[in-house]
Amino acid sequence: MAGIGIVDSVSNHSVDQTVDRLKGILQSRGLTLFALVDHSGEAEKVGIKMPPTRLLIFGSPKAGTPLMLAAPSIAIDLPLKILVWQDGEGKVWVSYNSPDYLRERHGFPAELLQNIGAVESLAAAAAG
């Protein structure tokens, strides 16, 4: 049920397990986890129930800064984000913005695509 430019993959793990796996992968690759937003936890605080939904915001200034220098508007989409969420049927998903879509959206040079291309392998490793 992906929107424009969003890649969705099924996870073989629970939301908590997928998030933990992703945190470990980020650390092992030397990436900084800037924030972990627990959307469902925040919703619960105001009396609204929703399935587990967590957003990880991460990156590396070494990879992101050249992109922002080439196309300043990409700063609205950086740091990178991976959403881990559970649908109404209990299936867990890992979602992220397609690097190709971000390139098309912001118009940065093709040679810089590798700076954000790792999001695909990160998501796959966390979901697998």
Feature map (PLM): residue ranges:
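Terminal, regulation- and interaction-focused segments at domain boundaries
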Residues: M1-R29
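Amphipathic alpha-helical interface surfaces
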Residues: T18, L22, H39, A63-G64, ...
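Beta-strand/loop substructures that line and gate deep hydrophobic ligand-binding cavities in soluble
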Residues: K81-P109
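Compact, glycine-rich, soluble single-domain proteins
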Residues: F34-L83
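Well-ordered alpha/beta subsegment
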Residues: E104-G128
